Each structure stands twice: as structure tokens, then as C-alpha cells.
């Protein structure tokens, strides 16, 4: 890892989420050379309590005049380097709620030696001081924001170093090949001939391993961010009823009036470890209502960014020209499921009202949002789309930043193949090989500039 200038100032921030009436405990974190001294200056600790490392003290944070208490607290002392950041760290645990937390933080920041921490700065210091690798720090951030158990599992694997170890192994193999080639360039007469076939085979094997990581990143993205499923169709076909049925809660207003849904409504469930967000959109139709037009415009934008579109039609009334018109308006690059709703209202003629080309579609499910009939078929379809087949065997998954660098690495390795094919001198082999190594070094944090680190950690939450 690159060596950066050691941090000299002391930082402080609220380390827990704080909302009015939410959470009984909150924590303020202080890190740096002044952390312990600052803490001693704002708390009253009764009796003889030891401020040595990894001790928990009991006391009260006081007002500046030391005459009034702000709150009753526990103080956790962790002297560097045996702390999260590698520096002296003090955590003050107080009662939850905005007022006591803010007043304690204000007391701390009143000291000139302490400033408010930037987003992700505690984690950044942990990386700079060698307490964490960059990928471990990113995994901690992902654990905090995990929306499913599988996402949390992937984050824990990253914290344990699985991503770092895997990428470092690939990078080491590339360095070994670069070393072999450069040694032949510099000392060709003193060494045996380069086994070019072995080098080529090793590059092929590395590309295979890297490509697997790239493929898994897509599945990992689904696990972290979830799938967006847009419900669309003409008004009053039961889109809102279906969303309420799937989410098991009354998220949308259900009436017999066409065009009732004008806003974009969302509801989330977890299927096989993947968050699935159902988006109930305004019905697509020609209308003169200005408000409804705005809703329809939003619907079209939502459909473009969906991972799956469910087109709902009234199975009891049959497939209409309006349904056909909506079908033709849908983005062709987004997977589509057609759902015939209101099967509870069908009769013998209902089947004949639906064109054969619709009935023959593999992506067709008949359901009653009112009774739940056919719901299992719909869930099974969604499970095939985003279920166990997507998460099985998924142990590590690159985030967006890591994926971009992995793709850049792959591109460099593809360029090496062209050099092989054109039978260019060994010097040309080393150019893209060295670039690939640099990309992987940036991914793991072993080859980073301080400005890049600042950019990465600026996306973290404050206090982490």
C-alpha cells in the first residue's frame, strides 16, 4: 500500500443513526491524539476509574461550566494501534435522541484540537494506518446498508478479507508473469528461453477467474440493490390490488375508478435473499387530466429503468386493443411478464377473449389479486428470475467501483492477446500486463493516490 502522511488532527462524529424517538442508545466517536484528553475534559467520572486501554468507564458529560450534566454515559477507551482507526479512540455512549447527542458533540467540537469528521473518515484512517484493507472498509459500509441477509453475508465475507485475498492472488500471478518476461528482456543471454505457451495459458486462466468475478458482480448488485419490478397496464386492471397482495400490506389505494393511481408507489419483499421492489405505476392511457398525464410520464421513465416489467390485463374482459397498444410501448430490452388478473370473475368465454399468441407465451401467469389464486405461479416465476439460482454459490461480489477496475483489467488482458497474435516483441507484452496489475492494485488499495481515497470514502456515511 502507498504510504500517506499520518493524520495529526483529532476528529469526532455521531457514529449511530439518530432520529427523534428512535433508538435508546447513541454513540459519539472520537479518534486522534487528543481523543482521550478531550474526553477527560468533558466528563465527570466518579471514584477511581482506570483510563487505560480497552476499559469501559461510567460517568456524566457536563456542561462547559462543569456544574450541570448533559447526560449519563459510558466511555469506551481504545488506545492505538489497537483500535478501529489505529489511533487513540474514545466512544461515548449516551441515551438516544437528537438533543443529548448533539449537545455532547458540540462540547467535543468546542475544543480547537478537534474537528468534525468527514464522511467515511474513520474508515479512511483505518485504511491509511493499515488496520483495514480498502475492500474491507468498503464491505463494512455495505454491511451497514445491507437490505437482506444475503447482502449482509456477502459484506461479512468482504470484511473477512475474501475479496482482498482473491484479487491479490490474481494480481500476484500477473506479477509473476511480468517478472518472467522482464527478466528475459534484461538478461536474455543468462536465462533459459521464455516459455511463451505457459505465459499465454496462465493469462487465459487468469481471464477465466476474473470473468467469473465480473459475472458474479451482476448477481451481487441484485443482492445489494435488489430488483425493480414495474407493474403496468391500462387503468383499473388491478395493478394496485396485485401490489398489495404481493407485499401483504395496503400500499396502494384500490377503487373501481380508472386512473386512481397517479403517483409512483413502491413496496419491497425479500425473495431468496434478494430485495424485490414492486413499483405500482399510473395506468397508461390517453387522458386530458394534467395530473394523470404527469403520472403517466413518470410511469414511462420508471419502465425504462426496471429490471422486470409485469404487464397486467383484465383476464375476465379479455385482451383489448388498449392492452396491445401498451405492449407495443414497452421497452424491448427489459424482460416482460404478462399477468392476466381477475381470474375470479372469468367464465367459459373468458379464455376465448385472449389471443392465442398471448396464451402461448411462456411468460404468462393467470391470477386473482382478490382471492390469491395463481399467486404461487407468479412467485415461482419471480424466484426463477431472482431466486436461489442467482445467489447459490455466491460468496464474494465486487461493488461498482471494483467492477469497473476488474473490467479495465480484463480489457488490458484482452489487449495482450492481440499482442500474442501479432507476434510482437516481449516489450509490448509488458505494457498491458503492467497496466492490468495497476488496475488490480487500485482495486485492493495497494496502488492508490490520496485523492482517489478521498473520493471513495466521501460516499460513506458520517461516523463510519
UniProtKB/Swiss-Prot annotation:
Which cofactors are named for this entry? K(+)
GO cellular component terms, alphabetically, are: cytosol
Any one GO MF annotation of this record? GTPase activity
Q: Does the keyword Nucleotide-binding apply?
A: yes
How does the cofactor bind to this protein, according to its record?
Answer: Binds 1 potassium ion per subunit.
- In this chain the TrmE-type G domain maps to 226-387
Name the Enzyme Commission number(s) assigned to this protein: 3.6.-.-
- Purpose: Exhibits a very high intrinsic GTPase hydrolysis rate. Involved in the addition of a carboxymethylaminomethyl (cmnm) group at the wobble position (U34) of certain tRNAs, forming tRNA-cmnm(5)s(2)U34.
Q: What taxonomic ancestry is recorded?
A: Bacteria, Bacillati, Cyanobacteriota, Cyanophyceae, Synechococcales
**Stated name of the protein:** tRNA modification GTPase MnmE
The entry's keywords = Cytoplasm, GTP-binding, Hydrolase, Magnesium, Metal-binding, Nucleotide-binding, Potassium, tRNA processing
Q: Fetch the SUPFAM superfamilies from UniProt.
A: P-loop containing nucleoside triphosphate hydrolases
Instruction: Give the record's subunit note.
Output: Homodimer. Heterotetramer of two MnmE and two MnmG subunits.
GO terms, biological process: tRNA methylation; tRNA wobble uridine modification
Amino acid at each position: 500500500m502507498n504510504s500517506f502522511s499520518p493524520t495529526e488532527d483529532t476528529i469526532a462524529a455521531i457514529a449511530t443513526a439518530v432520529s427523534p424517538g428512535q433508538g435508546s442508545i447513541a454513540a459519539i466517536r472520537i479518534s486522534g491524539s487528543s481523543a482521550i484528553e478531550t474526553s477527560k475534559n468533558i466528563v465527570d467520572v466518579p471514584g477511581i476509574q482506570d483510563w487505560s486501554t480497552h476499559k469501559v468507564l461510567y460517568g456524566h458529560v457536563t456542561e462547559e461550566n462543569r456544574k450541570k450534566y448533559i447526560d449519563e454515559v459510558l466511555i469506551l477507551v481504545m488506545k492505538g494501534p489497537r483500535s478501529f482507526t489505529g489511533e487513540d479512540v474514545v466512544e461515548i455512549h449516551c441515551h438516544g435522541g437528537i438533543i443529548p447527542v448533539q449537545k455532547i458533540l458540540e462540547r467535543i467540537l468546542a475544543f480547537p484540537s478537534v474537528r468534525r469528521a468527514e464522511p467515511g473518515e474513520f474508515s479512511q484512517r483505518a485504511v491509511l494506518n493499515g488496520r483495514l484493507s480498502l475492500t474491507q472498509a468498503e464491505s463494512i459500509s455495505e454491511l451497514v446498508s445491507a437490505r437482506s441477509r444475503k447482502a449482509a453475508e456477502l459484506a461479512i465475507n468482504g470484511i473477512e478479507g475474501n475479496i482482498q485475498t482473491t484479487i491479490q492472488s490474481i494480481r500476484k500471478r500477473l506479477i509473476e508473469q511480468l517478472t518472467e518476461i522482464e527478466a528475459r528482456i534484461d538478461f536474455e543471454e543468462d536465462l533459459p528461453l521464455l516459455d511463451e505457451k505457459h505465459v499465454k495459458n496462465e493469462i487465459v486462466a487468469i481471464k477465466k477467474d476474473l470473468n467469473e468475478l465480473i459475472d458474479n458482480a451482476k448477481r451481487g448488485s441484485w443482492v445489494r440493490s435488489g430488483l425493480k419490478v414495474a407493474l403496468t397496464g391500462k387503468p383499473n386492471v388491478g395493478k394496485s390490488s396485485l401490489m398489495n397482495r404481493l407485499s401483504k400490506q395496503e400500499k396502494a389505494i384500490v377503487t373501481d375508478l380508472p386512473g386512481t393511481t397517479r403517483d409512483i408507489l413502491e413496496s419491497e419483499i425479500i425473495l431468496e435473499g434478494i430485495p424485490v421492489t414492486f413499483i405500482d405505476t399510473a395506468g397508461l392511457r390517453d387522458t386530458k387530466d394534467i395530473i394523470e398525464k404527469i403520472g403517466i410520464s413518470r410511469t414511462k421513465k420508471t419502465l425504462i429503468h426496471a429490471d422486470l416489467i409485469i404487464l397486467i390485463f383484465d383476464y375476465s374482459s379479455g385482451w383489448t386493443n388498449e392492452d396491445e397498444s401498451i405492449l407495443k410501448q414497452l421497452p424491448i430490452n427489459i424482460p416482460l411478464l404478462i399477468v392476466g388478473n381477475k381470474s375470479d370473475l372469468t367464465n367459459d368465454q373468458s379464455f376465448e377473449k385472449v389471443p392465442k399468441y398471448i396464451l402461448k407465451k411462456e411468460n404468462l401467469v393467470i391470477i386473482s389479486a382478490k382471492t390469491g389464486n395463481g399467486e404461487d405461479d407468479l412467485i415461482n416465476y419471480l424466484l426463477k428470475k431472482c431466486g436461489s439460482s442467482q445467489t447459490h454459490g455466491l460468496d464474494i461480489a465486487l461493488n461498482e467501483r471494483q467492477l469497473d477496475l476488474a473490467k479495465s483489467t480484463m480489457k488490458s488482458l484482452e489487449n495482450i492477446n492481440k499482442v500474442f497474435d501479432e507476434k510482437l516483441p516481449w516489450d509490448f507484452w509488458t505494457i498491458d500486463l503492467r497496466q492490468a496489475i495497476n488496475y488490480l492494485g487500485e482495486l485492493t488499495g495497494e496502488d492508490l493516490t490520496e485523492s482517489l481515497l478521498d473520493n471513495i470514502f466521501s460516499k460513506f456515511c458520517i461516523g463510519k
